[in-house]
Amino acid sequence: MGTDEVIEAVVVGDVMLDSWLHGSAKRLAQEAPVPVMRLEATEDAPGGAANTAANLVALGARVRLVGIVGDDACGAELERVLRLAGVGIDLLTVPGRRTAHKRRLVTSGQLTARYDEEDHGVLPGWAERELLARLAGAVAGADVVVACDYGGGVFTPAVRRALAGAPLLVVDAHAVAPWRECAPAAVLPNYEEVVRLLGGTAGPIDRLSYLTAHSERVLELTGAAIVVTTLDGEGTLLHRSGPDAGVGYVWEHHVEPGRDLAAV
């Protein structure tokens, strides 16, 4: 691919609407000792797989987003903000299903609460078949496919298998083990997800040393050529298999509260 060519990317997975409710609190409620927040502004943005799609567009890719939404106001708002971001929308509307919505309450600049509305119900058979048909058409012309699996019900075994032949498959999943049979090019778990993969529990230990010691096992369990593990503000650790096997460089980065990489 030439340097001037646009990357064709397909993002498939669990889409959601992220909302931030901004306000200030200067008194307590009469009915309970809780602050009364005066709502001053609301900010809506693509979340989950939709956020990944918007980020890829911002990096210069041409993106097609495949996923599931409900026939509700939240789904309509998600499509609106995706269009503003320049994302190609291929979202299947399932009547009676609720679009995932995460609301963050920000009081005087401080994140104080998050309210989630989600639907983890099994996809109807017709919806799975339609999703598979849309994926087949989308993946055929893609340079890269990104799967965002946050447990929202999109990735049935059949949908995962349909992505096994993708030209370059990158997986961001809360549970990466089910993706092993797809042999992804890369998976992007956070530290806690890697610990669960290894059968342990996250504790107050040296995270970098722990991940480095288990690098080969992590690659084996995921079936991926590359594993990129996010460590919040500590940075990112890269595990690579093959001729260039090893553990990559870790760099620090600033994480804004409420917008971190593990906030899905």
What is the predicted role of each segment?
Residues 2-3, 263:
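Short, flexible hinge/linker loops that cap or flank conserved catalytic cores
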Residues 4, 139-140, 181-182:
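A short, aliphatic-rich alpha-helical micro-motif
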Residues 8-9, 17-146, 157:
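Conserved N-terminal subdomain of the carbohydrate kinase-like
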Residues 10-12, 114, 143-146, 170, ...:
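Structural motif
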Residues 13, 67-70, 173, 231:
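Short beta-strand/turn micro-motifs composed of small residues
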Residues 14-15, 150:
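Active-site metal-binding loops of divalent metal-dependent hydrolases
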Residues 150-252:
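Conserved phosphate/ATP/ADP-binding segment of small-molecule kinases
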Residues 252-264:
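Short glycine/threonine-rich catalytic loop with a Thr-x-Gly-x-Asp
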